[in-house]
Amino acid sequence: MANGHSFKHVSYLWDEAKAAALHGDEVGLLVYRSNLLGADLRLTNYGGGNTSCKVKAMDPISANEVEVMWVKGSGGDLGTMKRNGLAALYVDRLRSLVNVYRGKAFEDEMVQLFNHCIYDLDSKAPSIDTPLHAFLPFKHIDHLHPDAAIAIAASKDGEAITKELFKGTIGWVPWQRPGFDLGLQLKKCLDENPGIRGIMLGSHGLFTWGNTAYESYVNTLEVIETCADFVEQMTQANGLVFGGEKLTALPESERRKQALTLAPVLRGLCSSQQSMIGHFSDDPRVLQFVNSQDLQRLAPMGTSCPDHFLRTKISPLVLD
């Protein structure tokens, strides 16, 4: 329990003292919020997701006040990101790119045009997700790939579940390749559903927001917590997971002994072109999947969120 917020499936890490020390520094609070979100891998995988804030700043050429968006730049990790990991861009210039946008076939050229919108010349390179934040009017925005949300977003009835679970307070945008047009689709969803607290992207992830860094942080946690509660309830109601158990797991000591024997062989094979580090996991949830009836059917289907491809590649090797 912290400041009236209690969560079961996510970690509430906000420290009032640390946040107070950053009072008035919206970009500093953005970095702080990003680090907290990235510290919980249930919210987004390493290197995944992006966050932003919009602030007023003085234009160095005209001396006029302008709106600037600070957003996680290309690459990097939310959990360890510093200020130099952000890109700062003129909001009005980003939004005016709609006047030269030629359609989905020309998404790549739009990424190059982001460079003409840069406010801080020391910025990190803008990512392809930049327009997704630019076309939403909110001061603080989080875009994450939480496992619990993706379980809904990637399901056959994802849109209907989202609508029912959140009583219409979370919008829905079907899957499409990230880019400029997806930013326009987010804006359209918001225009058609004023007052929503977030948007679920089919087979992709989640957008949430707030007027302050703290409001955005708590909103994000609350939405993900609701998704996780739903997944847990459905799992318990359905009884069998992944078709039920096919194999019984070995005792822990025996599992570790076999892993110790097998690891050098697998690591050697995986390191044939470059050195690799191996990791062994016998988490109960992992065992539930690898020992299941549906392993052979589900494993080749790959991950449910394209963002995870960066770390796991498309599908795993299954050894009997």
Name each model-derived stretch.
Residues 1-320:
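Glycine-rich flexible loops
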